A protein has these predicted regions:
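HDAC/HDAC-like amidohydrolase catalytic core signature
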Residues: 1-162
Length: 163
């Protein structure tokens, strides 16, 4: 039987984007309800994982950008750009999301799992080195790819994005 890890955390639900925002916690709440069903939950592994370190995030993002995102923790609502709204939980959730990706890559490398799915918020594949973009605070995909290359010695990493 395949070992599929599903990464989820209540902190991802605490990232608030506003009632009418396209990127909503309801997406994960719906999936959580399904995953909590006994006949479904038994098919997956739900690993414990740590948040990404600042050093891991800094491998892909500038110090200034990280400070800008961290500063949003002082606000109940703050816009980093026209599409990217944060709340006081967003910075912590973003570090946790990047940590989920790193942990999944580490477990895949150690052959502890066959595949993984990161049910994270805020999403993380549009952010650039120096700015949030497209609902994303940090680029979890780039952070994970760099981790695989620099820490685990992978020469190439393929990224497929179909949104």
């Amino acid at each position: 039987m395949r070992r599929t890890a599903v990464y989820r955390d209540p902190l991802f639900l605490a990232h608030q984007t506003g009632r009418d925002h396209l990127e909503s916690s309801e997406r994960l709440r719906t999936l959580d309800r399904e995953l909590d069903r006994p006949e479904v939950a038994g098919q997956f592994v739900f690993p414990d994982f740590a948040s990404a370190t600042i050093a891991a995030v800094q491998a892909n993002h500038s110090r200034e950008h990280i400070r800008e995102v961290a500063a949003t923790a002082a606000h109940t609502a703050f816009y980093l750009d026209a599409d990217t709204r944060t709340s006081n939980a967003s910075y912590g959730a973003a570090l946790r999301a990047a940590g989920a990706v790193i942990d999944g890559i580490e477990r895949l490398d150690r052959d502890e799992i066959d595949n993984g799915f990161c049910l994270v918020r805020p999403p993380g594949h549009h952010a650039e080195r120096d700015q949030a973009m497209g609902f994303c605070l940090f680029n979890n995909v780039a952070i994970g790819a760099r981790w695989a290359r620099k820490r685990l010695g992978y020469e190439r990493v393929m990224i497929v994005d179909w949104d």
